[in-house]
Amino acid sequence: MRQFIVIGHDVPTDPDAVSLADLPGAGRLDVLCRCLNSAFFLSHDLRDNVRVWLVVGDEYAIRFEGSELRRLNPDERSTAALVRGALAAREKAIGSMAANPSPGVYIRTQSLSGLLESVADDGPLVTLHEDGQPVVDIDPSAEPTFVLSDHHSFDDAETALLAAHADRRVSLGPEPLHADHAITVAHNYLDTDGYNRY
Amino acid sequence: MRQFIVIGHDVPTDPDAVSLADLPGAGRLDVLCRCLNSAFFLSHDLRDNVRVWLVVGDEYAIRFEGSELRRLNPDERSTAALVRGALAAREKAIGSMAANPSPGVYIRTQSLSGLLESVADDGPLVTLHEDGQPVVDIDPSAEPTFVLSDHHSFDDAETALLAAHADRRVSLGPEPLHADHAITVAHNYLDTDGYNRY
Protein backbone atom coordinates (compact mmCIF):
# COMPACT_ATOMS: atom_id res chain seq x y z
CA MET A 1 0.00 0.00 0.00
CA ARG A 2 1.35 3.38 -1.03
CA GLN A 3 -0.02 6.29 0.95
CA PHE A 4 0.06 10.01 0.28
CA ILE A 5 -0.92 12.62 2.86
CA VAL A 6 -1.57 16.03 1.32
CA ILE A 7 -2.07 19.05 3.54
CA GLY A 8 -4.58 21.61 2.30
CA HIS A 9 -3.95 24.75 4.29
CA ASP A 10 -6.56 27.04 2.81
CA VAL A 11 -9.32 24.74 1.54
CA PRO A 12 -12.53 25.65 3.39
CA THR A 13 -14.15 22.99 5.57
CA ASP A 14 -17.57 24.38 4.63
CA PRO A 15 -18.70 22.81 1.32
CA ASP A 16 -20.87 25.87 0.59
CA ALA A 17 -17.64 27.89 0.29
CA VAL A 18 -16.46 25.67 -2.58
CA SER A 19 -17.47 26.86 -6.05
CA LEU A 20 -16.74 24.31 -8.77
CA ALA A 21 -16.35 27.24 -11.18
CA ASP A 22 -13.48 28.67 -9.13
CA LEU A 23 -11.34 25.95 -7.60
CA PRO A 24 -8.29 28.20 -7.13
CA GLY A 25 -10.59 30.52 -5.15
CA ALA A 26 -11.59 27.59 -2.91
CA GLY A 27 -8.24 27.62 -1.12
CA ARG A 28 -6.50 26.15 -4.15
CA LEU A 29 -8.62 23.03 -4.12
CA ASP A 30 -7.37 22.52 -7.69
CA VAL A 31 -4.00 21.51 -6.26
CA LEU A 32 -5.53 18.77 -4.11
CA CYS A 33 -7.61 17.52 -7.06
CA ARG A 34 -4.50 17.15 -9.18
CA CYS A 35 -2.85 15.25 -6.34
CA LEU A 36 -5.75 12.79 -6.32
CA ASN A 37 -5.43 12.44 -10.09
CA SER A 38 -1.69 11.72 -9.90
CA ALA A 39 -2.10 9.32 -7.02
CA PHE A 40 -4.79 7.14 -8.57
CA PHE A 41 -4.83 7.28 -12.34
CA LEU A 42 -3.14 4.99 -14.76
CA SER A 43 -4.02 4.99 -18.42
CA HIS A 44 -7.48 3.37 -18.48
CA ASP A 45 -7.13 2.10 -14.92
CA LEU A 46 -7.05 3.11 -11.26
CA ARG A 47 -4.27 2.17 -8.88
CA ASP A 48 -5.95 0.04 -6.24
CA ASN A 49 -2.91 -0.18 -3.96
CA VAL A 50 -3.03 3.52 -3.10
CA ARG A 51 -4.58 5.49 -0.24
CA VAL A 52 -4.67 9.28 -0.16
CA TRP A 53 -5.40 11.46 2.85
CA LEU A 54 -6.36 15.09 2.38
CA VAL A 55 -5.96 17.09 5.58
CA VAL A 56 -8.35 20.05 5.45
CA GLY A 57 -7.93 22.91 7.89
CA ASP A 58 -6.05 20.60 10.28
CA GLU A 59 -9.52 19.53 11.30
CA TYR A 60 -10.70 16.84 8.89
CA ALA A 61 -8.93 13.95 7.20
CA ILE A 62 -10.57 12.80 3.97
CA ARG A 63 -9.44 9.32 2.97
CA PHE A 64 -9.60 8.02 -0.61
CA GLU A 65 -9.25 4.27 -0.92
CA GLY A 66 -8.07 3.15 -4.36
CA SER A 67 -9.53 -0.34 -4.10
CA GLU A 68 -13.03 1.02 -3.43
CA LEU A 69 -13.23 4.22 -5.49
CA ARG A 70 -15.99 4.22 -8.08
CA ARG A 71 -16.75 7.82 -9.00
CA LEU A 72 -13.34 9.40 -9.46
CA ASN A 73 -12.75 10.98 -12.85
CA PRO A 74 -9.52 12.59 -13.99
CA ASP A 75 -10.73 16.17 -14.41
CA GLU A 76 -10.36 18.67 -11.58
CA ARG A 77 -13.97 19.78 -11.49
CA SER A 78 -15.52 16.35 -10.96
CA THR A 79 -12.82 15.46 -8.44
CA ALA A 80 -13.59 18.67 -6.57
CA ALA A 81 -17.27 17.66 -6.50
CA LEU A 82 -16.23 14.45 -4.75
CA VAL A 83 -14.22 16.42 -2.17
CA ARG A 84 -17.12 18.83 -1.67
CA GLY A 85 -19.42 15.84 -1.14
CA ALA A 86 -17.07 14.56 1.52
CA LEU A 87 -17.07 17.94 3.28
CA ALA A 88 -20.87 17.98 3.14
CA ALA A 89 -20.82 14.76 5.20
CA ARG A 90 -18.45 16.14 7.83
CA GLU A 91 -21.11 16.50 10.49
CA LYS A 92 -21.85 12.79 10.24
CA ALA A 93 -18.24 12.09 11.27
CA ILE A 94 -18.55 11.80 15.02
CA GLY A 95 -15.59 11.16 17.30
CA SER A 96 -13.35 8.62 15.65
CA MET A 97 -16.18 7.35 13.40
CA ALA A 98 -15.72 8.24 9.73
CA ALA A 99 -18.56 9.13 7.40
CA ASN A 100 -18.57 7.42 3.99
CA PRO A 101 -20.39 9.72 1.57
CA SER A 102 -19.38 7.88 -1.62
CA PRO A 103 -17.61 4.64 -2.52
CA GLY A 104 -14.02 4.74 -1.31
CA VAL A 105 -14.32 8.22 0.23
CA TYR A 106 -14.29 8.67 4.01
CA ILE A 107 -14.13 11.76 6.19
CA ARG A 108 -13.25 11.87 9.86
CA THR A 109 -12.42 14.52 12.41
CA GLN A 110 -8.65 14.38 12.70
CA SER A 111 -5.70 16.72 12.86
CA LEU A 112 -2.41 16.15 11.08
CA SER A 113 -0.89 15.15 14.41
CA GLY A 114 -3.50 12.45 14.99
CA LEU A 115 -3.22 11.23 11.42
CA LEU A 116 0.56 10.87 11.61
CA GLU A 117 0.17 8.80 14.76
CA SER A 118 -2.48 6.60 13.15
CA VAL A 119 -0.30 5.74 10.13
CA ALA A 120 2.93 5.33 12.10
CA ASP A 121 2.96 1.54 11.82
CA ASP A 122 1.98 1.38 8.13
CA GLY A 123 5.41 1.99 6.60
CA PRO A 124 8.23 4.52 6.54
CA LEU A 125 7.02 8.12 6.66
CA VAL A 126 8.73 10.17 3.97
CA THR A 127 8.77 13.93 3.46
CA LEU A 128 10.10 15.58 0.34
CA HIS A 129 12.76 18.24 0.69
CA GLU A 130 15.29 19.80 -1.64
CA ASP A 131 18.08 18.94 0.81
CA GLY A 132 16.82 15.40 1.34
CA GLN A 133 18.51 12.16 0.42
CA PRO A 134 18.29 11.39 -3.32
CA VAL A 135 15.34 9.06 -3.91
CA VAL A 136 17.63 6.68 -5.78
CA ASP A 137 19.35 5.90 -2.45
CA ILE A 138 16.06 4.71 -0.92
CA ASP A 139 14.94 1.09 -0.97
CA PRO A 140 11.98 1.03 -3.41
CA SER A 141 10.58 -2.17 -1.92
CA ALA A 142 9.27 -0.33 1.15
CA GLU A 143 5.66 0.81 1.10
CA PRO A 144 6.10 4.40 2.14
CA THR A 145 3.72 7.08 3.28
CA PHE A 146 4.62 10.37 1.61
CA VAL A 147 3.64 13.67 3.21
CA LEU A 148 3.21 16.64 0.88
CA SER A 149 1.95 20.16 1.11
CA ASP A 150 -0.28 22.14 -1.23
CA HIS A 151 0.96 25.43 -2.72
CA HIS A 152 2.29 26.51 0.69
CA SER A 153 5.38 25.16 2.40
CA PHE A 154 4.91 23.24 5.63
CA ASP A 155 4.38 25.75 8.45
CA ASP A 156 6.46 25.71 11.63
CA ALA A 157 4.09 23.47 13.58
CA GLU A 158 3.92 20.95 10.70
CA THR A 159 7.68 21.03 10.28
CA ALA A 160 8.09 20.19 13.96
CA LEU A 161 5.54 17.37 13.74
CA LEU A 162 7.22 15.92 10.68
CA ALA A 163 10.65 16.17 12.28
CA ALA A 164 9.27 14.07 15.11
CA HIS A 165 7.49 11.48 12.95
CA ALA A 166 9.23 11.21 9.58
CA ASP A 167 11.73 8.47 8.90
CA ARG A 168 13.34 10.14 5.90
CA ARG A 169 13.65 13.40 3.99
CA VAL A 170 13.93 12.65 0.29
CA SER A 171 14.78 14.68 -2.81
CA LEU A 172 13.15 13.77 -6.13
CA GLY A 173 15.41 16.00 -8.20
CA PRO A 174 17.04 19.41 -8.42
CA GLU A 175 13.87 21.25 -9.47
CA PRO A 176 11.14 22.13 -6.94
CA LEU A 177 8.01 20.26 -8.01
CA HIS A 178 4.31 20.79 -7.48
CA ALA A 179 2.86 18.21 -5.08
CA ASP A 180 0.97 16.38 -7.83
CA HIS A 181 4.09 16.11 -9.99
CA ALA A 182 6.02 14.82 -6.99
CA ILE A 183 3.42 12.07 -6.53
CA THR A 184 3.86 11.06 -10.18
CA VAL A 185 7.64 10.87 -9.81
CA ALA A 186 7.37 8.91 -6.55
CA HIS A 187 5.01 6.41 -8.20
CA ASN A 188 7.37 6.02 -11.15
CA TYR A 189 10.30 5.36 -8.83
CA LEU A 190 8.33 2.64 -7.05
CA ASP A 191 6.77 1.25 -10.27
CA THR A 192 10.21 0.72 -11.77
CA ASP A 193 11.76 -0.72 -8.59
CA GLY A 194 14.09 2.24 -8.42
CA TYR A 195 14.47 2.82 -12.18
CA ASN A 196 15.44 -0.81 -12.78
CA ARG A 197 12.29 -2.35 -14.25
CA TYR A 198 10.77 -1.16 -17.53
CA MET B 1 14.75 23.33 -25.52
CA ARG B 2 12.45 20.47 -24.55
CA GLN B 3 9.42 20.07 -26.77
CA PHE B 4 6.22 18.13 -26.28
CA ILE B 5 3.70 17.52 -29.05
CA VAL B 6 0.31 16.42 -27.75
CA ILE B 7 -2.35 15.20 -30.15
CA GLY B 8 -5.93 16.12 -29.25
CA HIS B 9 -8.14 13.87 -31.33
CA ASP B 10 -11.56 15.02 -30.19
CA VAL B 11 -11.08 18.63 -29.05
CA PRO B 12 -13.33 20.83 -31.21
CA THR B 13 -11.66 23.45 -33.38
CA ASP B 14 -14.67 25.75 -32.81
CA PRO B 15 -14.19 27.67 -29.54
CA ASP B 16 -17.96 28.00 -29.14
CA ALA B 17 -18.10 24.23 -28.68
CA VAL B 18 -15.83 24.48 -25.61
CA SER B 19 -17.67 24.91 -22.30
CA LEU B 20 -15.35 25.72 -19.40
CA ALA B 21 -17.87 24.01 -17.11
CA ASP B 22 -17.47 20.71 -18.98
CA LEU B 23 -13.92 20.17 -20.19
CA PRO B 24 -14.27 16.38 -20.50
CA GLY B 25 -17.24 17.07 -22.78
CA ALA B 26 -15.06 19.34 -24.96
CA GLY B 27 -13.24 16.35 -26.46
CA ARG B 28 -11.35 15.75 -23.22
CA LEU B 29 -9.74 19.17 -23.28
CA ASP B 30 -8.99 18.53 -19.58
CA VAL B 31 -6.29 16.07 -20.68
CA LEU B 32 -4.52 18.68 -22.80
CA CYS B 33 -4.75 21.25 -19.99
CA ARG B 34 -3.05 18.87 -17.59
CA CYS B 35 -0.34 18.28 -20.20
CA LEU B 36 0.33 22.03 -20.34
CA ASN B 37 0.47 22.12 -16.54
CA SER B 38 2.99 19.26 -16.37
CA ALA B 39 5.09 20.69 -19.16
CA PHE B 40 5.46 24.21 -17.75
CA PHE B 41 4.99 24.35 -13.99
CA LEU B 42 7.61 24.18 -11.34
CA SER B 43 6.86 25.13 -7.77
CA HIS B 44 6.48 28.94 -7.92
CA ASP B 45 8.07 29.09 -11.37
CA LEU B 46 7.54 28.34 -15.05
CA ARG B 47 9.95 26.30 -17.14
CA ASP B 48 11.16 28.70 -19.80
CA ASN B 49 13.09 26.10 -21.81
CA VAL B 50 9.92 24.27 -22.86
CA ARG B 51 7.71 24.46 -25.93
CA VAL B 52 4.41 22.60 -26.21
CA TRP B 53 2.42 21.96 -29.37
CA LEU B 54 -1.23 20.95 -29.18
CA VAL B 55 -2.46 19.44 -32.42
CA VAL B 56 -6.21 19.98 -32.63
CA GLY B 57 -8.26 18.05 -35.15
CA ASP B 58 -5.12 17.48 -37.26
CA GLU B 59 -5.86 20.97 -38.53
CA TYR B 60 -4.36 23.49 -36.10
CA ALA B 61 -1.11 23.51 -34.12
CA ILE B 62 -1.25 25.67 -31.00
CA ARG B 63 2.23 26.52 -29.74
CA PHE B 64 2.96 27.50 -26.13
CA GLU B 65 6.33 29.11 -25.61
CA GLY B 66 7.59 28.85 -22.01
CA SER B 67 9.87 31.85 -22.24
CA GLU B 68 6.99 34.14 -23.27
CA LEU B 69 3.96 32.80 -21.40
CA ARG B 70 2.34 35.30 -19.04
CA ARG B 71 -1.20 34.15 -18.37
CA LEU B 72 -0.87 30.44 -17.69
CA ASN B 73 -2.24 29.29 -14.33
CA PRO B 74 -2.09 25.74 -13.02
CA ASP B 75 -5.81 24.97 -12.86
CA GLU B 76 -7.52 23.25 -15.77
CA ARG B 77 -10.29 25.79 -16.23
CA SER B 78 -8.07 28.83 -16.73
CA THR B 79 -5.73 26.84 -18.95
CA ALA B 80 -8.72 25.78 -21.05
CA ALA B 81 -9.71 29.44 -21.38
CA LEU B 82 -6.27 30.10 -22.87
CA VAL B 83 -6.73 27.25 -25.37
CA ARG B 84 -10.21 28.49 -26.23
CA GLY B 85 -8.78 31.96 -26.79
CA ALA B 86 -6.26 30.46 -29.19
CA LEU B 87 -9.00 28.65 -31.10
CA ALA B 88 -10.97 31.90 -31.29
CA ALA B 89 -8.01 33.41 -33.18
CA ARG B 90 -7.76 30.53 -35.66
CA GLU B 91 -9.20 32.52 -38.56
CA LYS B 92 -6.40 35.05 -38.18
CA ALA B 93 -3.90 32.26 -38.86
CA ILE B 94 -3.48 32.50 -42.61
CA GLY B 95 -1.24 30.17 -44.60
CA SER B 96 1.94 29.61 -42.65
CA MET B 97 1.40 32.80 -40.59
CA ALA B 98 0.56 32.14 -36.95
CA ALA B 99 -1.84 34.24 -34.91
CA ASN B 100 -0.66 35.27 -31.42
CA PRO B 101 -3.76 35.78 -29.28
CA SER B 102 -1.96 36.02 -25.93
CA PRO B 103 1.65 36.19 -24.74
CA GLY B 104 3.48 33.01 -25.64
CA VAL B 105 0.47 31.41 -27.37
CA TYR B 106 0.43 30.96 -31.15
CA ILE B 107 -1.94 29.14 -33.46
CA ARG B 108 -1.29 28.17 -37.03
CA THR B 109 -2.91 25.97 -39.63
CA GLN B 110 -0.88 22.79 -39.59
CA SER B 111 -1.38 19.05 -39.62
CA LEU B 112 0.62 16.60 -37.53
CA SER B 113 2.52 15.64 -40.67
CA GLY B 114 3.58 19.24 -41.33
CA LEU B 115 4.46 19.79 -37.69
CA LEU B 116 6.69 16.71 -37.54
CA GLU B 117 8.53 17.96 -40.62
CA SER B 118 8.96 21.43 -39.12
CA VAL B 119 10.54 20.15 -35.88
CA ALA B 120 12.70 17.49 -37.57
CA ASP B 121 15.95 19.41 -37.09
CA ASP B 122 15.27 20.51 -33.50
CA GLY B 123 16.36 17.33 -31.72
CA PRO B 124 15.59 13.62 -31.56
CA LEU B 125 11.90 12.81 -31.95
CA VAL B 126 10.76 10.42 -29.24
CA THR B 127 7.51 8.51 -28.89
CA LEU B 128 6.49 6.68 -25.75
CA HIS B 129 5.58 3.03 -26.01
CA GLU B 130 5.32 0.16 -23.56
CA ASP B 131 7.66 -1.91 -25.73
CA GLY B 132 10.12 0.96 -26.18
CA GLN B 133 13.68 1.17 -24.96
CA PRO B 134 13.91 1.95 -21.20
CA VAL B 135 14.38 5.69 -20.76
CA VAL B 136 17.43 5.03 -18.59
CA ASP B 137 19.24 3.80 -21.71
CA ILE B 138 18.74 7.15 -23.46
CA ASP B 139 21.28 9.97 -23.33
CA PRO B 140 19.63 12.66 -21.16
CA SER B 141 21.79 15.42 -22.61
CA ALA B 142 19.82 15.47 -25.87
CA GLU B 143 17.02 17.99 -26.17
CA PRO B 144 14.25 15.74 -27.33
CA THR B 145 10.83 16.34 -28.81
CA PHE B 146 8.32 13.97 -27.24
CA VAL B 147 5.13 13.05 -29.06
CA LEU B 148 2.17 12.03 -26.94
CA SER B 149 -1.49 11.29 -27.45
CA ASP B 150 -4.52 12.31 -25.39
CA HIS B 151 -6.85 9.64 -23.96
CA HIS B 152 -6.81 7.78 -27.31
CA SER B 153 -3.95 5.73 -28.69
CA PHE B 154 -2.25 6.96 -31.84
CA ASP B 155 -4.41 6.01 -34.81
CA ASP B 156 -3.07 4.08 -37.81
CA ALA B 157 -2.16 7.17 -39.82
CA GLU B 158 -0.35 8.73 -36.85
CA THR B 159 1.45 5.49 -36.12
CA ALA B 160 2.70 5.37 -39.72
CA LEU B 161 3.81 9.02 -39.57
CA LEU B 162 5.64 8.46 -36.30
CA ALA B 163 7.30 5.31 -37.61
CA ALA B 164 8.66 7.43 -40.46
CA HIS B 165 9.78 10.40 -38.32
CA ALA B 166 10.60 9.19 -34.81
CA ASP B 167 14.17 8.49 -33.78
CA ARG B 168 13.26 6.40 -30.75
CA ARG B 169 10.49 4.56 -28.98
CA VAL B 170 10.95 4.88 -25.25
CA SER B 171 9.36 3.26 -22.19
CA LEU B 172 9.04 5.27 -18.98
CA GLY B 173 8.09 2.30 -16.83
CA PRO B 174 5.96 -0.83 -16.62
CA GLU B 175 2.68 1.01 -15.94
CA PRO B 176 0.77 2.78 -18.74
CA LEU B 177 0.70 6.48 -17.85
CA HIS B 178 -1.57 9.37 -18.72
CA ALA B 179 0.12 11.81 -21.10
CA ASP B 180 0.51 14.50 -18.43
CA HIS B 181 2.12 12.07 -16.01
CA ALA B 182 4.46 10.91 -18.76
CA ILE B 183 5.55 14.53 -19.31
CA THR B 184 6.32 14.85 -15.59
CA VAL B 185 8.42 11.68 -15.64
CA ALA B 186 10.26 12.75 -18.79
CA HIS B 187 11.07 16.13 -17.24
CA ASN B 188 12.35 14.45 -14.09
CA TYR B 189 14.59 12.17 -16.11
CA LEU B 190 16.09 15.15 -17.92
CA ASP B 191 16.23 17.35 -14.78
CA THR B 192 18.28 14.73 -12.96
CA ASP B 193 20.57 14.00 -15.92
CA GLY B 194 19.24 10.47 -16.05
CA TYR B 195 18.61 10.02 -12.32
CA ASN B 196 22.15 11.05 -11.46
CA ARG B 197 21.76 14.62 -10.19
CA TYR B 198 19.68 15.51 -7.11
Curated annotation (Swiss-Prot), chains A, B:
The keyword Methyltransferase applies. Its EC number is 2.1.1.257. GO terms for molecular function: S-adenosylmethionine-dependent methyltransferase activity; tRNA methyltransferase activity. It catalyses: pseudouridine(54) in tRNA + S-adenosyl-L-methionine = N(1)-methylpseudouridine(54) in tRNA + S-adenosyl-L-homocysteine + H(+). It comes from the Archaea. InterPro entries: Alpha/beta_knot_MTases, TrmY, tRNA_m1G_MTases_N. GO terms for cellular component: cytoplasm. One of its GO terms (biological process) is tRNA methylation. Keywords: Cytoplasm, Methyltransferase, S-adenosyl-L-methionine, Transferase, tRNA processing. It holds the Pfam family Methyltrn_RNA_2. The keyword Methyltransferase applies. Gene3D superfamilies: 3.40.1280.10. Transmembrane segments: none annotated. S-adenosyl-L-methionine binds at residue 128. It is an enzyme of class 2 (transferase). It is found in: Cytoplasm. Homodimer. Specifically catalyzes the N1-methylation of pseudouridine at position 54 (Psi54) in tRNAs. Belongs to the methyltransferase superfamily. TrmY family. This is tRNA (pseudouridine(54)-N(1))-methyltransferase. The gene is trmY.
